[in-house]
Amino acid sequence: MAAPSPSLIKIVAPIKPVPFKRVMTSGKRRFNSARYSQFKDALGFFALKAMHGQEPLQGAIKLSAEFYKRRKGILTGQWGDVDNFLKAVLDSLNGICYLDDGQVVQVSAVKKFGEPRVLIELEELQ
């Protein structure tokens, strides 16, 4: 089977979405939470698989993301802000799908109920 078009990348990550949280400090040391670091590593793994050995995208990028959680409670409130989920995705894909998240010029994101997962579509704009 041929690799997908290098200007369109689809990532399906069957992992629970984790929002970005501010970097924690301990004395002079700065670190992310273990949960956030594990999410970034896992999403990076699925992104590498989706790249099929391609080089990172070079141009302006449109990013669409869907974040799914099991139906418990409501989509608003304590589950996390959609912009923090996006920040986690942008950080995770740096150097894998694109050289720098500054290349992302258009975003779309939604939180939904369903089997926990993250769906991402990246399209290089002409």
Predicted regions and their residues:
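Acidic, proline/glycine-enriched N-terminal capping motif
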Residues: 1-126
